[in-house]
Design a protein with these regions (language model features):
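Autoprocessing Asn-cyclization modules and mimics
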Residues: 99-184
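N-terminal leader/signal peptides at the extreme start of proteins
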Residues: 1-32
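Short linear sequence signals and composition-biased patches located at protein termini or domain-edge surfaces
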Residues: 70, 74, 87-89, 94-96, ...
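Acidic/polar residues at beta-strand termini and the immediately following turn/coil
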Residues: 28, 153-155, 170, 204, ...
Length: 291
């Protein structure tokens, strides 16, 4: 045992140097103390927290920027569609037609009519025995009409008409059928069948978190055209230079001022907790009115 002790600690000396060496080792052990470990963990936690905070900020900024881009695309697409359709209001319509129906509903609503294929029309040469009877346009070319499309029949004497759905076109016989539904009345000889378009634009606020710009063509179900559009306003410029919310007659309208407001899909917590918004305004000259 003594030899083993001497091998490990060295031989004892009178001066006690061996004891001093042992004390030195005990005073400076290898590794870290508990306090040092706690400090290191604290510093690491601060660094990780700061890095995570930077990541969250950048990630949130990226999400908001993506929403802003989508918002700008939606509002531009919606405005372009309305400009294109409203500019056509009244084109090719027979006399007595109302090409614009305005509604100051806040958000506003507008309905416009125009003939989308001018020249594609045929006259009925035989009075309809029943509202469900086919339209006999003997001697007229009906090849421009397509099945499964909307058309319009107009009685110039009664100055009335309606949309109907074409189910079959007999080009050789010049007959047009509408088997899905009868008309509201029997149209006389001399009534005209034509292609006419009707577009209705309005805001659907059924889901208050996601209002949408809706478009309805003829009698089809309304469809979403642009998402997260919260406001739509129309002002009608009259021939005398005055702008009104509801025009007294479409014939005195010369221009339509459109204001469209879009917002982001979600609120921005870094923007006072509110939605980011964009508003576009366009002045459309309605060249086919008042001619």
């Amino acid at each position: 045992m003594k030899n083993l002790h001497e091998k490990l600690l060295g031989a004892p000396s009178p001066s006690g140097k061996n004891n001093e060496r042992v004390s030195a080792r005990r005073g400076h052990p290898e590794g870290f103390t508990l306090v040092e470990l706690l400090i290191a963990l604290l510093i690491t936690g601060v660094m990780v927290s700061a890095g995570f905070g930077i990541y969250l900020t950048q990630h949130e900024g990226w999400i908001i920027q993506e929403q802003i881009t989508n918002m700008q695309q939606n509002i531009r697409a919606g405005m372009h569609e309305m400009e294109t359709r409203i500019r056509m209001a009244g084109y090719g319509l027979p006399g007595g037609f109302q090409p614009i129906y305005a509604a100051n509903t806040n958000p506003d609503t507008i309905t416009i009519l125009f003939q989308n294929e001018f020249g594609c029309e045929a006259t009925i040469e035989h009075a309809m025995p029943q509202p469900s009877s086919e339209l006999r346009c003997d001697g007229h070319d009906v090849s421009c009409f397509d099945e499964n499309t909307w058309a319009y029949i107009y009685d110039p004497v009664a100055d009335t008409g309606e949309f109907f759905y074409i189910t079959k076109v007999q080009v050789a016989a010049s007959h047009i059928q509408h088997n899905t539904a009868p008309l509201s009345r029997r149209y006389p000889k001399g009534s005209t069948v034509m292609y006419m378009d009707m577009y209705k634009f309005f805001i659907d606020t059924t889901d208050t978190n996601h209002p949408n710009l809706m478009v309805q063509r003829v009698l089809d179900p309304p469809a979403v055209y642009a998402e997260d559009i919260e406001d739509l306003q129309f002002r009608y410029g009259l021939a005398n230079g005055v702008f009104v919310d509801i025009p007294p007659a479409a014939s005195v309208v010369r221009e339509i001022l459109i204001t469209l407001t879009a917002r982001t899909e979600r609120k921005d917590l870094q923007f006072a907790g509110e939605y980011r918004r964009r508003t576009l305004t366009s002045d459309v000259k309605v060249r086919n009115l008042g001619l």
